[in-house]
């Protein structure tokens, strides 16, 4: 597994930790703010960028804590990082993007992106070896394709 992938894995996990600590008070008087597509993309890309950075940090910490040689990790070590760091982190990113609320008229597209990301994250947790396979489509291909078509610049990048 490359350092970049491990880094990406670590960043997603860190987002999950940070987001879990964030709460909001809801007194029932708040009104929902509907983002424009441009605002949605900007905020979504910020979530993905921060997530990638945190995935990198978390993957590096995980590798250090478990004495994983990031230059020559075994397949089992790679799978452990993918299922333990990347999958949960990507699920958290999906949750955060979903929480932004879809721009008017873009509900189906944004729901499809989130659903594809959730599906990919679940597959990575359940069968991390799919990310390491060099043939066929990967568990994140659909989410990446949909995110790119929607206009994301950070989300949907490998």
Predicted features along the sequence, with ranges:
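Bacterial N-terminal signal peptides that target proteins for export
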Residues: 1-10
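Enrichment for repetitive, rod-forming helical segments
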Residues: 10-11, 116
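C-terminal motif of bacterial Sec signal peptides marking the signal peptidase cleavage site
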Residues: 18-21
């Amino acid at each position: 597994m490359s350092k970049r992938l491990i880094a990406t894995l670590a960043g997603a996990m860190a987002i999950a930790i940070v987001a879990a600590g964030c709460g909001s008070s809801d007194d029932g008087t708040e009104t929902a703010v509907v983002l424009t597509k441009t605002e949605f993309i900007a905020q979504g890309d910020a979530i993905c960028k921060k997530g990638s950075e945190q995935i990198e940090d978390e993957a590096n910490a995980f590798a250090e804590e478990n004495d994983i040689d990031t230059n020559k990790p075994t397949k089992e070590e790679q799978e452990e990082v993918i299922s333990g760091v990347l999958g949960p982190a990507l699920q958290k990113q999906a949750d955060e993007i979903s929480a932004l609320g879809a721009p008017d008229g873009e509900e189906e597209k944004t729901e499809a992106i989130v659903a594809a990301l959730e599906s990919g994250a679940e597959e990575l947790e359940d069968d991390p070896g799919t990310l390491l396979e060099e043939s066929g489509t990967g568990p994140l291909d659909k989410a990446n394709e949909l995110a790119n078509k929607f206009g994301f610049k950070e989300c949907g990048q490998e």
